[in-house]
Amino acid sequence: MNTHHHKTFLLHGVTGSGKTQLYLKATAKCISQDKTAIILVPEIILTDQIVRRFVETFGDEVVVFHRKLTVQQRNNNWERLRRKDSHIIIGARSAVFAPAEDIGLIVVDEEHDTSYKQEDMVRYHARNVALWRGEAHGCPVILGSATPSVTSYYKAKQGEYQLLELPHRIFEQPMPKVTIVDMKEEILHGNYSVFSDAMSSLIQKTLNEHNQMIILLNRRGYSTFVMCRDCGETIMCPHCDVAMVYHQAGEELRCHYCEHHEPIPTVCPKCNSQRIKFFGSGTQKVEEELRRHFKSARIARLDQDVTKNKQLAEDILHDFGTHKYDILLGTQMVSKGHDFKDVTAVGILTADSVLNIPVYSASERTFDLLTQTSGRAGRGDKPGSVVIQTYNPLNYAIIKSKAHDYVGFYNEEIQNRKALGYPPFREMIHMVVRHQNMETLEAIANRIVSDLEAHKGNTDILINGPYEASIKKVRDMYRLAIMIRGTDLSNLKEYIYNSWIFTQEGLLIDVDPV
């Protein structure tokens, strides 16, 4: 790998195949030539193991950048880089802007991860910035993942990137055996529990053998909504068009979009009935169920409510790594790059949670989440087992994840994208127009669409909308969406940037939505 020549490598390696070891070797070569390496990871708190491996290997050569550094800590890091006391920068997405001058290598680990896309304030994708900096500095860029983004893999197949593959785990360890459970069948057989019979058996087997297990449920809170059993009224957030979620801690209802919270009502606000019932299961409720059914199990929970406290999250991961817990239960953050040698089992409670979100990449996100989470099992010297619970057992993303078959998934997904005109075959711009008054909102949105139609030219550009956004109100602002697709949107982007549209108050513009 030539640190003086720009080239993009897509490193496709199955979970546990040794991608980090390759990063270490490439970094060693880079700093031996007195150049700087930038290593991007999705989230520092959740990828502490890769940071530790770099620090253990390179010591003081490493500086870590993340958003929670104090100004003084950040300045100290910059000074170390300026004096060339350190040559390795590790950090989450914002580290891609680190003030390094003589860059010889950029690595984007887990390049598929959606957390590389900043969704608020200045919107950018750290992977795209990394590619731009690599080209500007004339250095290689490595994009690594067990589940590469469909767009990156397509570019590799087209010859734009060089594809490197690690198809086997280190020491030829087998991939975990995956069982798919159809939850409709469980209900037909009288099992209404959150745990299928196969899931319960796997949990008990893991505990009996003194191994560890990771359980994924991509919904935090206790119950996902609260409803009156007499009139059917669902308790909604007064500021957002979403159901309030019951959180056991604090005994309150909470909105996950605006953080509004209120006490649990004793009667229905619509009909005054006292027959208020909690529906659905979040991580807090599943934790309670685990403690009730498996009394000897030592259980830790890792979700957004926990990771607000950085030290607590780090302590949980450290303690799980030293086997102080038997089960780690959490949202999708439990799927992120963890390498625990005693984890022999993984349980995925609701494989459909991501599959049903209204975005073109829902199947890709589902395959990524299932494959990455399954890949946490069997990374030591013991074989791994995985149980995936779903109501859609015939969906191709779920079937291909069972076989750890990325190429098979890609081949089916890329055909669907081509037929429907989605990336990588067309560029996309997603707009959300917001206003407190619905009539004013409709007028603004319609004017934007009319203006875009008038300036798109004689091209294949399609403009859909305005239509109701997936969540029609957030923080007292009504929302309408506009979707633009076309093989080349450069002229329309330039027009938007230089027109009144760009300065329209309340408008969110997302280029290349993930």
Where are the regions a protein language model picked out?
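Conserved short beta-strand edge segments in small beta-sheet-based binding/regulatory domains
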Residues: 458-464, 502-514
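Pre-Walker A adenine-sensing motif
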Residues: 1-3
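A carboxyl-terminal module marker
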Residues: 450, 454-456, 461-474
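Short Gly/Pro-enriched loop/turn and capping motifs at secondary-structure junctions
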Residues: 470, 489-490
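Short, flexible, solvent-exposed loop/turn segments with mixed acidic/basic and small polar residues
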Residues: 418-423, 469-475
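Short, low-order "capping/linker" segments at domain edges
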Residues: 472-485, 514
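Inter-lobe coupling/hinge segments of SF2-like helicase ATPases
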Residues: 5-442, 454, 481-482, 490, ...
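Short amphipathic alpha-helices in soluble, non-transmembrane regions
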Residues: 444-450, 492-501
